[in-house]
Structure formats: structure tokens, C-alpha cells
């Protein structure tokens, strides 16, 4: 079976080789681990954001940046495009922010292929029937500071690899790379909701594509988190090819999949998060979904469309 860590490492090698042009920095820790700063103490770049997103997806998706003219009638917004032939593995087996990395006073949300070694969380890998067995671990961290050896030692231990085979990429939410990679979760938001909220077998999703605008960079981490989530909730558009079985209600799946189908829909995410006392667990899981969904049922040939791009709320969130 394909290894998300080995595929991601190929992209990491490109980033290390082109670090100067990508405006990122590469540090080798004393334990041999490699830490790649993509926005903490460096500027990062659009290309770095594109590659970072591809690493998050375990190297099993094509990632691009474009400026489509049809999202807003008033102006064009730079957007992230995703397409994958391995939707369950690339989005839930790699990209999902499913590892809370906590060592001493360091805390970060971990995404990327190393999760498939540490099985974070185990239930996800049971659902998709996947586990990586590589001897290298590649993890991306959404954090405002860089990890030390104690953190990479912990990652190595959890992944059962040597510290010198650990590669960690770091980007704050309030950075350009951070903004790009969160919009790059547009397809994953849909597969996540299918599995976690709608309890649909995501292994039936055979191919997927999506696009979402890149939120403006905001130095305030909480406001940045709000804007980046809104980019997908109000501006993300996705297309899923599903091989259904007799009895699957794909029409209902499509109708319940967009963010607008959730109870908490209707306000910028920052306002919702604030009302929830900044507690993610108080927020309806169904809100974390793309704005618009199209599903092609490969068994029947039917196509279902639901949801819509909410330009008004998107512009309000972005301050435009």
C-alpha cells in the first residue's frame, strides 16, 4: 500500500533544497530531527504554502494556487485548488488535524502523514483501513513557536522511528503559509463531516476535488483562525465521486454535507467561537464543511448539488 510519509518526504526534500527561494528556514536539531520553519521566524511564500499543503496531504494530492474570477462578482480572490485520487487516505489519513502534540509548555495541532504511524486518532485509521509502516515521519504543526528536541523525541517515540528520521514543518495560523494550508483543507472538511457527523463510509469516495479562497493574513491568531475557517465554510466548493451501494441515500448525503446545513450556520466563525467561550467542543461538528458540494454517484450516474457560496458572510469575515 502507498506510504504517505515516503510520498510526503519527496516534497520535503524539494523544500529543503529550495529553502532560500521559498523564504523558509531549515534547522537540524542535536538529536538529528529536522525542523522547517514556514512562518514563525520567516516570511514563507505562496509556493511554500502550496508545498506545505501537499505535505499535509501525504503527497497524494495535486495542489495549486489560482485566481478564479467567478467566486465574487466584485473582485477575484486567490484560491487553493485540490484534487486527489486517494480522498480517504490523503485527507483523513494524513491532512486531518488529529494529533494534539503537547510536551511541557509546547502545544500544537499536528497534521500530516506521521499521524498514520502514530495512529492519531486510532478510530480514524480503523474506519479507513489504513496504517503506514514507513521508517520516516513527516508532521506539520500549526504553532506560533518552533518545537525543540523534547517535542521531536516524543514524535519519534509515538511513530516508532529514529529522531533523525523525523521531519517537522511549522506554520502559524497567522502566516501566509498557515492561511493557504487551511484553505487547502476544503476537500478534507467534507470527508471529515461525512465520517464524523454523517457516519458515511468514506472509502466509497473514490476521487475528489475542491477549491477555496485564501483568507487575508491577520497577525491576531484568533481572528486569523476565524477568517481561515470562513474561507472554507462560506467560500469552499467541492466535488466528490462516490461509488455508492444499494440503499445509500446519496441525495440526502449531499443535502446534509454543506456548512449551511449545520445548526450554527449564519455568523463568521470568530463570532461563533467567541460565543462558545473559545471551546471547539461546544461547536456543532457539522459546521466544519465546505460551502458548496457536488456529488457524482458513480453507480447510478446521478449528480447532486447542495449548498452555496455565501459572498456576503465571506466578505464580512475578510473585512471587504
UniProtKB/Swiss-Prot annotation:
Pathway: One-carbon metabolism; methanogenesis from CO(2); 5,10-methenyl-5,6,7,8-tetrahydromethanopterin from CO(2): step 3/3. One of its GO terms (molecular function) is coenzyme F420-dependent N5,N10-methenyltetrahydromethanopterin reductase activity. It comes from the Archaea. Its EC number is 3.5.4.27. One of its GO terms (cellular component) is cytoplasm. The keyword Hydrolase applies. SUPFAM superfamilies: Methenyltetrahydromethanopterin cyclohydrolase. It is an enzyme of class 3 (hydrolase). GO terms for biological process: methanogenesis, from carbon dioxide; one-carbon metabolic process. Its main location: cytoplasm. Keywords: Cytoplasm, Hydrolase, Methanogenesis, One-carbon metabolism. Belongs to the MCH family. Catalyzes the reversible interconversion of 5-formyl-H(4)MPT to methenyl-H(4)MPT(+). NCBIfam families: one_C_mch. Homodimer. This is Methenyltetrahydromethanopterin cyclohydrolase. It comes from Methanothermobacter marburgensis (strain ATCC BAA-927 / DSM 2133 / JCM 14651 / NBRC 100331 / OCM 82 / Marburg).
